């Protein structure tokens, strides 16, 4: 069994890779779902500013690995079926450290890479509550880079380029996941 921690900038294509993993029978845990749940629990709207405030506030209050720590019970529950697991949305070095401590050699980090212009186009085309406009997109990029996201992307063991078509990403992601399944 392998555990993949997926990282990348917003709208790079992590969700698409997670969907492909699910189609292959992998279990998927999306870290962002925990942030959304906490935002809703506080009675806040799922808007870019409130989701970002909650994510950042929890990191400042409890440490930058907090969302990974809160993810461990969910991930461990998914592992009981013996399935491969994909963690969607690892955001920084502290989260990576939590996952490495928990899963050791079974963990493989994968970065999904896409140009800023490509990602902005995708944000403007998709209908996600936490995306917002171009200004919100750039603010989110800066906020997430402040969580050491760039360093986490650079440290990834594997990369998936996603500046082409969706079918190209699907083909490349499928091939990478197949390769990781045979580890």
Model-derived segments and their meaning:
Residues 28, 109, 158-161:
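Short, well-ordered beta-strand core segments
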Residues 1-4:
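Extreme N-terminal starter segment of soluble prokaryotic enzymes
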Residues 65, 125-179, 183:
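Small-molecule kinase domains that catalyze NTP-dependent phosphoryl transfer to phosphate-bearing small molecules
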Residues 15:
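Walker A/P-loop
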Residues 27-98:
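ATP-dependent small-molecule kinase phosphotransfer cores
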Residues 12:
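ATP-binding Walker
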Residues 88-89, 102-130:
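Conserved phosphate-donor/acceptor-positioning beta-strand/loop module used by diverse small-molecule
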Residues 9, 21:
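P-loop (Walker A) phosphate-binding loop of NTP-binding proteins
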